[in-house]
Amino acid sequence: MALNLSQKQEVVAELADVAAKAHSLIAAEYAGTTVSQMTAMRKQARETGVFLKVVKNTLAARAVEGTDFAVAADKLVGPLLYAFSMEEPGAAGRLIKEFAKSNDKLQAKVVSIGGELFPAGHVDVLASLPTRDQALAMLARVLSEPAAMFARAVKAVGDKQGGGDAAAAAVAETAEA
């Protein structure tokens, strides 16, 4: 069904608002994907903070003008679905990669993040980015490791001199605090 001018303007405004707030964009060919597969993908997209929409490419190109994703405007050709990561940069990549495993017709065509356009093969790189919680856990581990190394060194010196357990326990308590 064809959209009238006001409906097209609403679609462009909605997509422009989403594009302005999004971290990354993946445009993927979806031809040959069944309705049940698309429904499952949309459900998972909502759960993972990904805005997923199928719109005409000309409307999408107008919507991304003035955003970081304007570099992708000339690559929007063919039947595409647009996946915008709203919460984490890698969320759309993980979604497309997961559904591409079970559906060989779903293929990423455009990958854009931070105003840069990447080859479609970079969807794997984007999908492998850690989530916010994983990144915070890695940071905490990196920050706590020097104190843990110091505690192990003090314990080793104490063990070598014969009274290491009490000294190491005291150092370990201060290192944890």
Swiss-Prot record:
Record's function text: Forms part of the ribosomal stalk, playing a central role in the interaction of the ribosome with GTP-bound translation factors.
Protein name: Large ribosomal subunit protein uL10
GO terms of molecular function: large ribosomal subunit rRNA binding
Gene Ontology biological-process annotations: translation
Annotated family: Belongs to the universal ribosomal protein uL10 family.
UniProt entry tagged with the keyword Iron-sulfur: no
Gene Ontology cellular-component annotations: ribonucleoprotein complex; ribosome
Record-linked InterPro entries: Ribosomal_uL10, Ribosomal_uL10-like_sf, Ribosomal_uL10_bac, Ribosomal_uL10_bac_type
Transmembrane segments: none
Species of the source: Xanthomonas oryzae pv. oryzae (strain KACC10331 / KXO85)
Alphabetized UniProt keyword annotations: Ribonucleoprotein, Ribosomal protein, RNA-binding, rRNA-binding
Complex formation: Part of the ribosomal stalk of the 50S ribosomal subunit. The N-terminus interacts with L11 and the large rRNA to form the base of the stalk. The C-terminus forms an elongated spine to which L12 dimers bind in a sequential fashion forming a multimeric L10(L12)X complex.
